Amino acid sequence: MLRTHYSNEITEELNGKRVKVAGWVQEVKDLGGIKFIWIRDREGIVQVTAPKKKVSQEIFKLIPKLNSEDVIVVEGIVNFTPKAKLGFEVIPEKLEVISRAKTPLPLDPTGKVKAELDTRLDNRFMDLRNPKVMAIFKIRSSVFRAVREFFYSEGFIEIHTPKIIATATEGGTELFPLKYFERDAFLAQSPQLYKQMMMATGLDKVFEIAPIFRAEEHNTTRHLNEAWSIDAEMAFIENEGEVMDLLERLISYVINYVREHNEKELKTLEFELNEPKRPFPRITYDKALEILSDLGKEIPWGEDIDTEGEKLLGKYMAENEGADLYFIYRYPSEAKPFYIMKYDEKPEVCRAFDLEYRGVEISSGGQREHRHDVLLEQIKEKGLNPKSFEFYLKAFEYGMPPHGGFGLGAERLIMRMLDIGNIREVILFPRDRRRLVP
């Protein structure tokens, strides 16, 4: 390897020892008889100090010729001293320029000079050199790691379902069509049907982390056309409350994992991530509409709570319940997909829920309808063709246990967890209504 240590691995035990550090030139300072280079790697900064009397003439003459964002390797001796900004410095014995950076740069990777989001996304490779941007994606990595750890600890099995499908998961037209040889196909908008089919296999508890594709023409700060979904399904449940319990445990685990493992990144972002208040409050859809009505926002029964309503409710729950996270459940059946189980005693209401995080929906779930005859009727009620779902319905004819699950938007979770205003900032190369490159 061209380096022996990252910046954060240089400790006092290495004082007087030889190391090789590598990264991007963040800054060069020439004070005449002494020159400085600050090298940035993914873990932080290394100060290279070059006194004229202690380094070769070749190195001394090369340093002023370095440009910002040149990639260099420095081999030298570690010196811990209070005079150094970071508490230590490296006195260079060798300096090699690996790659030169063009000038001017497309944006300032230190973030001191602000750039428009579009400029940043067009130059994402350089945008991530900004420590604050990199911190977001280190936290994103931790989120996915924590999700897997949680599900494995709960006895779940990871599955992988197809992303090229023949029919819509939930009906509707929000699908990206493609040619599959001589046939028409679509990109999957959800693994819903497949994870339910897994409940007939005996696997009982499954999860998947995978991309989903939705051809929605939204151009908002919280919508993407390609996003990552965290999906779970479990069998032999008694009601949707058990699914909400599972989701609450997952969210709490993830947030606490980030609090524990990403202190440095949270500090870089200057953000305090609080432990979630548990249990998450649970309010019915009817209660949510009542609260909104008291706040002057009227929503007809049966309609989804719109963006304005979600924000008002989020503010209300924070101020009155001290809760950032809360469930809304017992939705009107007409507002939810065909596979959600209705209450037998009140079929206009179903066993669905949404999880809201400070006024933004991050997850939807519920108990599914496992009775073949009832499910078939619900497909027809939604105006869908049962023949399009024969492969799915077949799994319900040979012994299907009661089951439920949820889909959780990874980007929305991260966006709300870190209080970031635009969802495009938490995915490397966003795909939205207007962006297909890079």
Swiss-Prot record:
L-aspartate binds at E170, R214, S364, R368. Its EC number is 6.1.1.12. The keyword Plastid does not apply. Belongs to the class-II aminoacyl-tRNA synthetase family. Type 2 subfamily. PANTHER family: ASPARTATE--TRNA LIGASE, CYTOPLASMIC, ASPARTYL-TRNA SYNTHETASE. This is Aspartate--tRNA(Asp) ligase. Its cofactor is Mg(2+). It is an enzyme of class 6 (ligase). NCBIfam families: aspS_nondisc, PRK05159.1. Mg(2+) 2 binds at E361, S364. Keywords: Aminoacyl-tRNA synthetase, ATP-binding, Cytoplasm, Ligase, Magnesium, Metal-binding, Nucleotide-binding, Protein biosynthesis.
